[in-house]
Design a protein with these regions (language model features):
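Solvent-exposed functional surfaces
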Residues: 24, 37-41, 49-246, 259, ...
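Charge-dense, extended regions
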Residues: 234-295
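A short, basic-hydrophobic beta/loop patch
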Residues: 1-54
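Conserved aromatic-histidine-acidic binding/catalytic patches
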Residues: 2-7, 185-193, 253
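Enrichment for repetitive, rod-forming helical segments
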Residues: 17-18, 115, 265
Length: 295
């Protein structure tokens, strides 16, 4: 129990082919039995999952690069079936289910949000590899100081979604909103159970930590507790309206939505800002921020 064997199989298959060639006579006998050569094996004890990931990245130089998403999915694949966050159900792509209920999230989306937290970038899935940017490794080193950053990230985000759901548990009535197309979502859960909001949240939390505004996920939980409930319903309507307007201007709709949610959470969770704890005000200011950054 507790042992992880990391093998990309490239070298293993190469060694197997060399041995088979030797045994079949394809390799001259004078070259010697390849199994007589030494094979280097490294064993690490007392190391956490992110420490393993860090070594996978730094020791993988020169090999075919994995995507950032693949790197982290390898380490956190066990969360698909053994999530430790109460009230959360992680859905894998092969399940074919759509997250609809409170606590249901696509595992892929949570991974993207967590990666945004690590890299302090809501566009993380466009990156080929964490090694492309040394700063990403520095951020990775910072989060390893926490006991279980994946659980902490997911628990904080789920806490936020629960706060939104408890403040407004109904369905938005958008008939009089004159939207240009179908609404982004009609419920609090529907708005915040997608990758766009999770990556925005991850990026915002990481940025606020870098600025020294928050120190840990306990501070994030505290900030969420202070969100004014009477601002939630109007805030959800405003988010849907802003995302509808954004859709007509966006060059890359998904990326622009991520930018909007990043700005939203930066405003909402910043205790030093005027919009702190006010969902409606944060949603409005986030749209203004979006316009300034994209025009």
């Amino acid at each position: 129990d507790g042992i992880k064997i990391l093998d990309g199989l490239q070298r293993s298959y190469t060694i197997r082919d060399v041995v088979l060639d030797y045994e079949s006579g394809k390799v001259p006998a004078e070259d010697g039995n390849p199994l007589n050569n030494l094979v280097r094996v490294e064993i690490y004890t007392g190391i956490n999952k992110l420490g393993i990931l860090y070594r996978m990245l730094t020791l993988n130089t020169g090999q075919t690069r994995m995507t950032t998403r693949h790197q982290i999915e390898i380490i956190y694949s066990d969360y698909k079936t053994n999530c430790q966050v109460p009230g959360v159900n992680l859905i894998s792509e092969v399940d074919g289910n759509i997250p609809r209920k409170l606590g249901d999230y696509h595992f892929r989306d949570v991974i993207e949000g967590f990666t945004s937290y690590i890299q302090e970038d809501f566009l993380t899935m466009d990156r080929l590899d964490i090694l492309d940017n040394v700063k990403d490794l520095e951020r990775l080193a910072k989060v390893t100081k926490e006991d279980n950053p994946f659980d902490d990230f997911l628990a904080a985000y789920h806490h936020f979604v629960c706060k939104m759901k408890s403040s407004f548990g109904g369905e938005l009535n958008v008939e009089d909103m004159k939207l240009s197309s179908n609404p982004y979502a009609l419920t609090a859960v529907g708005i915040f159970n997608k990758s766009q909001s999770m990556t925005g949240f991850g990026n915002a939390v990481s940025s606020l930590k870098s600025l020294g505004v928050i120190g840990s996920f306990k501070d994030v939980d505290s900030a969420i507790d202070e969100i004014s409930e009477h601002t939630v319903e109007d805030g959800l309507y405003r988010i849907v309206s802003c995302l509808d307007s954004l859709r007509e201007m966006a060059k890359k709709i998904g990326n622009d939505q991520r930018l909007y949610f990043y700005r939203f959470f930066r405003r909402l969770l910043d205790k030093e800002g005027a919009e702190f704890g006010n969902v409606d005000a944060a949603a409005e200011k986030a749209y203004n921020d979006y316009l300034r950054e994209t025009r």
